[in-house]
């Protein structure tokens, strides 16, 4: 038994090391890639100072943090709701952030600065989160709370569609592209949003013990002495914050929160002590690679990163499912 435990521990360490190396390679490639490829030897040249340090570095850091946040949010939701289909967009938080952003564009008549739009997106996400917490205080089961999140997401999606199709604002039309996800407008002015993600990410990665209990189910977690109501509220609030900040940075990005935790579980990473940091590393790596493809696929334009993540990730996920089912 002790030998098996040690073997599993070594395997987990190997996985984390491999994911760390993959993320580092993706980060370096992201800094080099673009219309003008700049190798590390030229990073401190005048051209490198502009393209690498002022343009690509803030974008790369934003992609890294958003990928980690979405993947961890997916792992948390799947444990919290005991549902393999749970992911950041399912609770309606992403759509709530979109409603906040569209309301800001309408009320501000397109004159609000980017930081104000970001705050409105976060506010929209947190409002949906507060509504979910209100439902949670009524001691609803996780399945009913999940359905409440789906209903809120549908309502928010309908509000966004009404606002977009009945508006003549050019800025509002452009939000349709933004809601498909993209990091094209990220620079150092959004660094406060990146900083806002870091403490919540680190805190959730340290909560492996309650997450392992939640993964056993409500009844087992309660029997083990876990204050279920408290942890449900805290995790929903933390997830709402991470998703709200992510949407404010890059728009709505699917697939990462749904598939990355699944892939790691299929690879044998089921303990949240390893799964949570693994999701952060794998989510960051996957979104960095998708962002590189979005930048390089077209010569004079940039693809929405949400389209890239779905196109590249769905076939991989189907292949893994078929392989696991043999």
Swiss-Prot record:
GO terms for cellular component: plasma membrane. The keyword ATP-binding does not apply. GO terms for molecular function: vitamin transmembrane transporter activity. Signal peptide: none annotated. InterPro entries: ABC_BtuC-like, ABC_transptr_BtuC, ABC_transptr_permease_BtuC. The chain crosses the membrane at residues 11-35, 57-81, 93-107, 114-138, 142-166, 191-206, 229-249, 258-267, 275-296, 305-324. It is found in: Cell inner membrane. It comes from the Bacteria. Residues 1-10, 82-92, 139-141, 207-228, 268-274, 325-326 are cytoplasmic. The complex is composed of two ATP-binding proteins (BtuD), two transmembrane proteins (BtuC) and a solute-binding protein (BtuF). This is Vitamin B12 import system permease protein BtuC.
